[in-house]
């Protein structure tokens, strides 16, 4: 199979991608978070191809993407007022909600659960694609399972060339880490995965928010999960990743004492002079944490090379988007 490159800047290419999706084909789609591996979320055979192309465990549910908030009612029932409040404030955008699912959604999409994860992406071309396709699009990150997520079309082509029909190139992703996921099916809202919408923003709107044990790394691989990204090793290059926190100077002393052949450093831009001779890669500025989220996966992919066996990764501290960046680094380690 030859993977076709399409442009999100061309309306005819968006229409062509929509036609492929309607006919059960796989198309990688751009979003503000990461690229998604898209299929008709109501077509069980098309959804199966997602799992096969990624090498993804089938107990890992998928996120359905819709073109506008009102489409939520077609795939979910018993939607609480909190969901509409969140949609009003954060859709279109990097927030996914877990809600009770209607019967028309295949069990393969939901991993057999009675709930489904849904989001309305910010990227206008992708919303138009979904509208033209006329179906919700199931789309996990467009990378081989376990590897760093894809934030450019070139990343997708590296992982998926010959495995999928097309890639819709929308340029680099703005946010750079996957969406925040919040479960609204319990007595209290529960954060299942941190992302572009922060816990602080959710609490300010909802008044309460529990943090799932999976976010804290306290979940076993035999646990049943309600959303993607909650178990299994994710986002990882082939090298061993060691997370290094603390002050810049103390971290540099620690790393330099241990640094050897086959090692690399993933650090903040301000720290590059501290790692002269240590093969450093900066993934953003410590003073602008959103540059860290935007640059993280691209940097991990750059360091996913046969000559690199160990990566010492500097991890931002604190809440907000830094919490999501730290979560992804810990999943990679």
Q: Could you tell me what each predicted segment is?
A:
Residues 1-333:
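Active-site-adjacent structural elements in enzyme catalytic cores
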